[in-house]
């Protein structure tokens, strides 16, 4: 329930376009921020702005349309999406990954093992960066599909027995 006092505090602490941009302008000028911001309220974009460079050499300025690899920052989103599928009975944590991805070469690995880093899968960088790997286009970003194809083609050795121990490997979330 909004009262006069809470409405007053909301107006004081409500960030506006100018204050947000000034904050990031200052950080950028100090060399402390290089990236893209987007601030929205109730699905309404308040501000969207790029700061700094996408590439330092050559000096390609960032735009709001540049894409970034999120890396491990995407894991909570992936885990949440998987658990929503479980809640909707569209997926089971005990499902074999092989039944979900036909070309996946390991029958005993489950969705739950991928989520908890207990699949035993080695890090994809260990087998995809190998000079003997079928990944020929080393100058472009490898995709999740590329990793699955390589796993199918070379069947890399497992780092540990599936379900036995925790071994942090980004390969798990590539598959999810």
Segments predicted by a language model, with ranges:
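Short acidic/polar alpha-helix capping motifs at helix-coil junctions
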Residues: 2-3, 47-48, 139-142
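Active-site-proximal loop and beta-strand segments within enzyme catalytic domains
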Residues: 56-169
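Solvent-exposed loop/turn segments at secondary-structure junctions
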Residues: 45, 121-122, 173
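Short, conserved catalytic-motif segment at the N-terminal edge
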Residues: 9-68, 92-94, 149-158
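Acidic/histidine-rich, surface-exposed loop or edge segments in extracytoplasmic proteins
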Residues: 1-9
